[in-house]
Regions:
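Domain-level recognition of nuclease-like catalytic cores that cleave nucleotide substrates
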Residues: 82-118
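Active-site donor-binding loop signature of nucleotide-sugar glycosyltransferases
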Residues: 29, 51-53, 112
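Mg2+/Mn2+-dependent nuclease catalytic core
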Residues: 55-77
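Short helix-to-loop capping/linker segments positioned immediately adjacent to catalytic or ligand/cofactor-binding
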Residues: 25-26, 81-83
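Acidic active-site catalytic centers that drive phospho-/nucleotidyl reactions
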Residues: 10, 37, 50, 93
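Conserved catalytic cores of phosphodiester-cleaving nucleases, focusing on short active-site segments
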Residues: 38-58, 71
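Active-site metal-binding core of divalent-cation-utilizing nuclease and nuclease-like domains
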Residues: 19-46
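Acidic-basic catalytic patches of nuclease active cores, encompassing PD-(D/E)XK
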Residues: 1-28
């Protein structure tokens, strides 16, 4: 089965995160109808990471707006299910990729995306 553009973009985002020192703990984790692309440890912080992929259609990067309630539901469910995780800060990141051409894209990492415009 051939990988889609989104699949390739998510692999690229995962590589970026790992190079930045993130330890990927989960990929495509879901609870009910809520889903998050990655859950990772970033120097002791638990990061819930949503990926946004957009073709270069003249509109630029995908919207960085996040669904606070969905993020919080996911975090609560994950922490409840994984009680062995030590106390740590939790944050919500958005990583956006703008596809420019086959194999080329721009990446933007918005750390702690819920802290802006709350």
């Amino acid at each position: 089965m051939e990988a889609t553009i989104r699949d390739k973009a998510e692999r690229g985002i995962k590589t970026y995160l790992e190079r930045q020192g993130f330890e990927i703990m989960e990929e495509g984790w879901a609870h009910g109808s809520d889903r998050i692309d990655f859950i990772a440890d970033d120097e002791g912080e638990l990061a819930f990471i949503d990926c946004r992929v957009n073709d270069n259609d003249g509109h630029g990067f995908a919207d960085d707006k996040v669904d606070r309630e969905a993020f919080e539901r996911l975090a609560a469910a994950y922490l409840t299910e994984h009680g062995e995780i030590p106390d740590s800060r939790v944050r919500f990141d958005v990583v956006s990729m703008l596809i420019l051409s086959e194999g080329t894209g721009l990446l933007r990492h918005h750390r702690n995306a819920l802290s802006v415009g709350d």
